[in-house]
Amino acid sequence: MGGGLIERYVAAMVLSAAGDTLGYFNGKWEFLRDGEKIHRQLAQMGDLEAIDVAQWRVSDDTIMHLATAEALMEAGSSPDLPQLYSLLAKHYRDCMGDMDGRAPGGACMQNAMQLDPDRADGWRIPFNSHEGGCGAAMRAMCIGLRFPHPSQLDTLIQVSIESGRMTHHHPTGYLGSLASALFTAYAVNGKSPRQWGKGLMEVLPEAKAYVTQSGYFVKENLQHWSYFEKEWEKYLELRGILDGKSAPVFPKPFGVKERDQFYIEVSYSGWGGSSGHDAPMIAYDALLAAGDSWKELAHRAFFHGGDSDSTATIAGCWWGVMHGFKGVNPSNYEKLEYRQRLEEAGRALYSLGSKEDTILGP
C-alpha cells in the first residue's frame, strides 16, 4: 500500500461525513422529497463549491460510522471476533447519546439501546421482518478500510453482517452493510467500479453460507434472502454491467427529475435510498456516472428527493478512497463537525488495514 493511500483513507472518512452533512443540511434536505426543489435551493446558494459546512451538522449516519471505526480501532490488530462484536455493540449503544438533532432511525435507536456488550452474545438481537432499512449500510464502509485484502474477505463478510444485524436483523438490512464494506475494499484495491456489482453477486452465496452456519434465526433469514439479490441483479442488468466488464448504460435524459423517479422505482417503500439494498445501489449508480467529479457525485447522490444523507455518506466514502480530496472545495469539509476524529480514524484504519493480519474466529 503506497504513501498516497493514507490520504485516501483520511478522505474516505472525511468526505463520507461531508456527503452526509451536505445531504442532510440540518434535516432540511434529508426529508425534502423533491429533488428539483433541493437543486433550486442549492443553485441559490451558489452551488456545491460555495457551501461552507461550518454551521451544518453531521447526521446519525456519521455518528454511527465513527462508532464502527472507533470500535475497529479499539480492537486493534488481530482481534478475535467475539471481542470485536462486543466493542461494536458498546460503541453503537454509547453513540446513541449523541443523536440530538441528528434524526436517528427507529431500528438503530431502539435496538442499539438494548445491546448488552458485557454479556456473552449480548450483541445479538432476534430476527425482525421490518428491519430492512439502510441503518446498517450507512455505517459499514470503514469495515472495508480495515479488512481490504482479498485474503480477508471471509472476515469482511462476517464483520459486516454481524455489525449490521446488531440493529438490522434482516437480509435486506445487513446485506446493505456487506455491500458498503465490500465496495470500499474494492476501491482500496483499485478495482474498476464497473466490476463491483458482479463481485457482490459472487460474494452473496458466501454470505448466505455464513448466515446458515452461524445458526442464528437461519430459517427466517433464508426466507427473506432473495429480495436483496433479485433487486441488485435487476439493477445490474438495467445498467448492462452484470458481466463486470461493460461500460454502464444510463438513460437519456437522466436529470434530477428522472433520477428522483428512478430512485423511487428501485426503493422498497417509495423513499429512495432508505433500505439496505437501495442506499448502496443509489450511491453506486452515482459513482459510476460521476467518474472523478465530486460535484457530479454530489448532484446525483447527495441532492435528491430520497434518503439523501445515507446515499451521500456511502458514496462520499467510496469516492474519497478512489480520489482523495482532488477537486473538492475545502469549504465542503474544512469546518466539518468531528473532522479531527474522522481524520484520526482514517489514519488509524490505514495503519491497521495495511497489515494483512489474521483474525481469530469465534
From Swiss-Prot:
Transmembrane segments: none
Top-level taxon of the source organism: Eukaryota
E.C. numbers: 3.2.2.19
Residues binding Mg(2+) 2: 307, 309-310
Cofactors: Mg(2+)
Record: residues binding Mg(2+) 1: 59-61, 309
Cofactor note: Binds 2 magnesium ions per subunit.
Top-level EC class: hydrolase
Regulation: Its activity is synergistically stimulated by magnesium and dithiothreitol (DTT) in vitro.
GO cellular component: extracellular space
Catalytic activity: N(omega)-(ADP-D-ribosyl)-L-arginyl-[protein] + H2O = ADP-D-ribose + L-arginyl-[protein]; alpha-NAD(+) + H2O = ADP-D-ribose + nicotinamide + H(+)
InterPro entries noted in UniProt: ADP-ribosylarg_hydro (IPR012108), ADP-ribosylglycohydrolase (IPR050792), Ribosyl_crysJ1 (IPR005502), Ribosyl_crysJ1_sf (IPR036705)
Disulfide bonding pattern of the chain: none
Gene Ontology BP term (one): protein de-ADP-ribosylation
Single Gene Ontology MF annotation: magnesium ion binding
Spans annotated as Substrate: 106-108, 168-170, 268-270, 274-275
Keyword entries, A-Z: Hydrolase, Magnesium, Metal-binding
Binding annotation for substrate: 90, 129, 135
Family: Belongs to the ADP-ribosylglycohydrolase family.
Task of the protein: Specifically acts as an arginine mono-ADP-ribosylhydrolase by mediating the removal of mono-ADP-ribose attached to arginine residues on proteins.
Assembly and oligomerization: Monomer.
UniProt name for this protein: ADP-ribosylhydrolase ARH1
Gene name tied to this protein: Adprh
